[in-house]
């Protein structure tokens, strides 16, 4: 599968996750914030909390849950990228409520698992 195909599939499932989270009451801010450090798929606001979302898709869960694809190295990149986003938008990371969620999608989008606070800063 080529890069274009992976990107198109990624966009499709990120769009599905975006719609799902909006139906849950989160307010969409931005998609695909990219830096040299990494990328954040989706950014939302829930009440006063900035929510950074990693979207993962697996066609078949027999090889494990899509959420398991977020390893410690990926989590560290997400956190560093989130701090860059906060800085760019004038937020102070020490005084800003934030969390890191994962949306795991399986079965061609028929199974969506939203894991709030899936990644902790430490």
UniProtKB/Swiss-Prot annotation:
Family: Belongs to the UPF0102 family.
Leader sequence residues: none
Protein name (record): UPF0102 protein VV0603
Molecular functions per Gene Ontology: nucleic acid binding
InterPro entries per record: Restrct_endonuc-II-like, tRNA_endonuc-like_dom_sf, UPF0102_YraN-like
